[in-house]
Swiss-Prot record:
This is Peptide deformylase 1. The active site is at E134. The gene is def1. GO terms for biological process: co-translational protein modification; translation. NCBIfam families: pept_deformyl, PRK00150.1-3. SUPFAM superfamilies: Peptide deformylase (SSF56420). Belongs to the polypeptide deformylase family. It comes from Vibrio parahaemolyticus serotype O3:K6 (strain RIMD 2210633).
Amino acid sequence: MSVLQVLTFPDDRLRTVAKPVDAVTPEIQKIVDDMIETMYDEEGIGLAATQVDIHKRIVVIDISETRDEPMVLINPEILEKRGEDGIEEGCLSVPGARALVPRAAEVTVKALDRDGKEFTFEADDLLAICVQHELDHLQGKLFVDYLSPLKRKRIQDKLAKIKRFNEKQQNA
């Protein structure tokens, strides 16, 4: 398994709409395994393939406290949304930024697992929010897109400043 590089906002590749997975092959399973390792390495609770420059409809999520219950969603689709919720969200592709995003409180989701078997599940609370956040990535959408242009610009400027600082540190 390998840790993959996570793209950061405003990288245009994050805006790519992911394509469906035609078949769950050993190559797809390796991508899934690498994504899980990357999610854990980055201390995230979810990761979409788009975030690691793989434009396929693959998401991994683990909201467990023990960090050992990864959920794999291949070609995920939200069948139903119910209620309203929202929490202050963060994102591995927008490091250091958090914002309140409106989401459905509950969702019904259909997907394929790591072995290509179809399953359907109900999600609420943090899992419902995480699923919606990660599926947004597959559509080329980020949580900052829900914010005002001013807030989005502030986040972009902050990330650019952090990037410049890190580059200076590496060159020193």
